[in-house]
Amino acid sequence: MTPDQNALVLSFLLTVGGLIGYLRKKSKVSLIAGTALGANFAWASKLMERGSSQGINYAFYGSLVLLASSGPRFYKSRKPVPMILTVLGVISTWYFYRLWA
């Protein structure tokens, strides 16, 4: 998969995850964070598709935000959803850092 496709997959997963969090638990934070990060990764994907190096920047910093927000939640709660988000954050940060650096 190309970097823009990876960013698009993350966009989809985060947006759907935020929507599910809202529908199941009425969590407005999940909805806002999921759609905001999802939009960030969608925009990053579009920029990468157009050949702009700014897309990598958006994806890398979005990955850092995902990791920084989910890591402490997983450390504190040890629940599966924060764990999955943390793993996604670690992998995506590593992946986009390699492209960014």
From Swiss-Prot:
Disulfide feature: none
Protein name stated in the entry: TMEM14 protein homolog P14E8.05c
InterPro entries found in the cross-reference section: TMEM14 (IPR005349), TMEM14_sf (IPR044890)
Membrane-traversing stretches: 7-24, 81-100
Pfam family name, one: Tmemb_14
Organism expressing this protein natively: Schizosaccharomyces pombe (strain 972 / ATCC 24843)
Keyword field: Endoplasmic reticulum, Membrane, Transmembrane, Transmembrane helix
Taxonomy, superkingdom: Eukaryota
PANTHER family attached to this UniProt entry: TMEM14 PROTEIN HOMOLOG YJR085C (PTHR12668:SF53), TRANSMEMBRANE PROTEIN 14, 15 (PTHR12668)
Subcellular location: Endoplasmic reticulum; Membrane
Membrane topology classification: Multi-pass membrane protein
GO cellular component term, pick one: mitochondrion
